[in-house]
From Swiss-Prot:
Pathway: Amino-acid biosynthesis; L-methionine biosynthesis via de novo pathway; L-methionine from L-homocysteine (MetE route): step 1/1. It comes from Xylella fastidiosa (strain Temecula1 / ATCC 700964). InterPro entries: Cbl-indep_Met_Synth_N, Cobalamin-indep_Met_synthase, Met_Synth_C/arc, UROD/MetE-like_sf. This is 5-methyltetrahydropteroyltriglutamate--homocysteine methyltransferase. 5-methyltetrahydropteroyltri-L-glutamate binds at R16, E17, L18, K19, K116, R520, C521, W566, E610. Catalyzes the transfer of a methyl group from 5-methyltetrahydrofolate to homocysteine resulting in methionine formation.
């Protein structure tokens, strides 16, 4: 019988139970025991769901209260000194302090840096290491969760982040080489593997996703060294797991490593199948990632079955496992909850639970079970209906794309001329202050939105409520002394969803939540067809906010690349083409904002770097169409209109030329968690336009001191001319409270005033 396995399951719960449990605990409403009870219930539910879906070997230790990379650092005692006292006194509080920071009980701790998990929209906490790092086992989470499942009668395969990937995903605070710590780390892995074997684990999934990256000779040698040592001690069988792309030139390396099985991504790396089959060592299991773990479209089961049969013919039925391409962390839990979704589109989709069923169908078809044919036929019909649907293809969009010319992507004049025109119009002081866009979405705001959507609040009453919140926001910014204001975005539930709801070609789920980080969940739109803007989307609220103040008001848009990256994107055409469609829709919106008297327009692109292909050789093509799309959206304005963009969680050193090519008048970037490290890019590259390096971290509730911000601004001033510098937070303030927001922004304005006075 063909084995069905899974690499990871969504943690948050079908109805975001984990989010609610975490936030209740952080507010002090529940204790650690209650939080852990919810966690155990979720794990049990998910293991049973996978078992009932026909998964023969589900994972364990894929669950986390916040982040699996943080879990790994915590497990191996890679805890920075500043957290030691709290961790020793209260491990769970210390764990959350590492994730979120802590400012209470005379404790003032920064959180660990956060960054994107490869090219996904999931964020992980970056472990901090140093040359004298000591590793030791702290707790027994992987063993405890394996035994927890076993007590339910379910045998699982524990998941570990592999030692080399763990080090490569970390940072050293003293500039030392991360891989030099391998010899210190491996004994702890060896100890853990031995304990897992003693607990009865037959297999361990050891994730080394960095195997799909460009690796230098030193890193390749680190892999060889690591697995040679892990192979010496008693251990369970190891499933070496790669995902997010083909192994490419690391295939030979992966096959040299002494593992008992190899998982490959056959969705993003279809082309690697022949090479793997021709070189897979005798006796080694092949886990074939045939179902897309990152997107929500139904699998072409005929195509997947063809690959599976081909693989089975080479390795034999007993050595072939069927799996998703990667962990299902990146997709919603269950499509069955979406009762009100357009029936046609719904029939084209598969969420985590349905993807497991697809794998079972493939396994049954491989085993020649007749019941598989019904599901195969249903899938064929759904895919054909999608190909033929008029909901997907619009001739007017194709015509507009064909009419694009180089002039579509150019401003009227170069930045030096535009900046003079803008300063004449806006009359801003040195070190102008602004925010990134959103202001706190309080419980009252969320409740009013929910009441409006459920019909309990009339449209006129809801609009009156939003106007009052917007005016409060504008008055608060004026009182604080900010120079360029925003309207607060109280009408918006999400920076992508808000726009997608107003664009043809997008559709939204009700419960299609996925984890972004910690308790932060997002509900990505689904781009199922050609994108068109039927009517203005933001003009009414921006114009209203501008009518309340004489100060410049920023129009706030989400950029085309970010809308693409943060959506589930159609897989029947190139991503670049979909991005250009979104850009044209935004171009129309930008023009309407300018006509309405909005002189500053921000087009956020926080996701531009995460769209980079994992292999550097593929970067140029992506950056070309990403930059082109931004310029399509932003170039149809007068010189006096100032175009801003915002980017967060980004490293710019290697894409600084592309960032400059966007030709935004002002960019704001996330820099505070990295203590302005991102500005290193500007030492070698003379960035031509204005820039606002974020001076405080909005992902943490702590209010920074004025001196901290002044120091960061002085660091920025050492790299950039003062006339190019803006002063702003790292990101939007949606998730913060009003009290801390007001205090932090007041401190920020005072910091800017100090620099002006020097």
């Amino acid at each position: 019988m063909t084995i069905v396995t899974n690499l990871g399951f969504p943690r948050i719960g079908a109805r975001r139970e984990l989010k609610r449990a975490l936030e209740s605990h952080w507010r002090g409403e529940t204790d650690a025991t209650q939080l852990q009870h919810t966690a155990r219930e979720l794990r049990a539910r998910h293991w049973r769901l996978q078992r009932d879906a026909g998964v023969d070997l589900p994972p364990s230790n894929d669950f986390s209260l916040y982040d699996h990379v943080l879990d790994t650092a915590f497990l191996f005692d890679a805890i920075p000194q500043r957290y030691r006292g709290l961790v020793d006194a209260d491990p769970l509080a210390g764990y959350f302090a590492m994730a979120r920071g802590r400012q209470a009980d005379n404790i003032d701790l920064h959180a660990l840096e956060m960054t994107k998990w490869f090219d996904t929209n999931y964020h992980y906490l970056v472990p901090e290491l140093h040359r004298d790092q000591h590793f030791a086992l702290r707790g027994n989470k992987p063993i405890a969760e394996f035994e927890e499942a076993l007590a339910l009668g379910i045998t699982t395969r524990p998941v570990l982040l592999g030692p080399v990937s763990f080090l490569l995903l970390s940072k050293t605070v003293d500039g030392s080489n991360r891989l030099d710590l391998l010899e210190r780390l491996l004994p702890v892995y060896t100890q853990l593997l031995r304990q897992l074997q003693e607990s009865g684990a037959e297999w361990v999934q050891i994730d080394e996703p960095t195997l799909v990256l460009d690796l230098d000779a030193q890193t390749q040698q680190a892999f060889r060294k690591a697995y040679a040592i892990l192979n010496q001690g008693p251990r369970p069988k190891l499933l070496l797991t790669s995902y997010f792309g083909p192994l490419g030139d690391n295939l030979e390396l992966a096959l040299q490593l002494p593992a008992d099985g190899l998982h490959i991504d056959l969705v993003r790396g279809t082309e690697q199948l022949d090479a793997v089959l021709n070189t897979l060592p005798a006796g080694r299991v092949l886990s074939a990632g045939l179902v897309n773990g990152r997107n929500i479209w139904r699998t072409d089961l005929d195509n997947a079955l063809t690959m599976a049969r081909y693989a089975q013919g080479h390795v034999g039925a007993d050595r072939l496992w069927l799996a998703p391409s990667c962990s299902l962390l990146h997709v919603p839990v269950d499509l069955e909850q979406e009762k009100n979704l357009d029936a046609d589109v719904r029939n084209w989709l598969a969420f985590a639970k349905q993807k497991l069923s697809e794998l079972r169908v493939l396994a049954d078809a491989l085993d020649n079970k007749p019941e598989a044919e019904t599901a195969l036929t249903q899938t064929r019909q759904a895919l054909e209906a999608r190909r033929q649907s008029p909901k997907v293809h619009r001739p007017d969009v194709a015509q507009r794309l064909a009419a694009l010319t180089p002039d579509t992507t150019r401003r009227n004049t170069a930045y030096p001329q535009r900046s003079q025109a803008q300063q004449h119009t806006l009359n801003l002081p040195a070190y102008p202050t602004t925010t990134i866009g959103s202001f706190p979405q309080t419980l009252e705001v969320r409740e009013a939105r929910a009441q409006f959507k459920s019909g309990k609040l009339s449209e006129s009453d809801y609009e009156a409520f939003l106007k009052a919140e917007t005016e409060r926001c504008v008055r608060t910014q004026e009182e604080i002394g900010l120079d360029v204001l925003v309207h607060g975005e109280f009408e918006r539930n999400d920076m992508v969803e808000y726009f997608g709801e107003q664009l043809d070609g997008f559709i939204f789920t009700k419960l299609g939540w996925v984890q972004s980080y910690g308790s932060r969940c997002v509900k990505p739109p689904i781009i199922y067809g050609d994108v068109v803007r039927p009517a203005p989307m933001t003009v009414t609220w921006s114009a209203y906010a501008q009518s309340l103040t004489d100060k410049p008001m920023k129009g706030m848009l989400t950029g085309p690349v970010t809308m693409l990256q943060w959506s589930f994107v159609r897989d029947d055409q190139e991503r670049a083409q979909t991005c250009r469609q979104i850009a044209l829709a935004l171009r129309d919106e930008v023009q309407d904002l300018e006509k309405a008297g909005i002189k500053v327009i921000q087009i956020d692109e926080p996701a531009i770097r995460e769209g980079l292909p994992l292999r550097r050789g593929e970067w140029a093509d992506y950056l070309n169409w990403a930059v082109e799309s931004f310029r399509i959206a932003s170039s149809n304005v007068h010189d006096t209109t100032q175009i801003h963009t915002h980017m967060c969680y980004s490293e710019f050193n290697d894409i600084i030329e592309a960032v400059a090519a966007l030709d935004a008048d002002v960019i704001s970037i996330e820099t505070s968690r990295s203590r302005m490290e991102l500005l290193d890019a500007f030492v070698k590259f003379r960035y031509p336009n204005a820039i606002g390096p974020g001076v405080y971290d909005i992902h943490s509730p702590r209010v920074p001191q004025e001196e901290e911000m002044v120091l960061l601004l002085k660091k920025a001033r050492a790299v950039l001319p003062p006339e190019q510098l803006w002063v702003n937070p790292d990101c939007g303030l949606k998730t913060r409270g009003w009290k801390e927001t007001r205090a932090a922004l007041q401190t920020m304005v005072h910091a800017a005033q100090r620099l002006r006075a020097e």
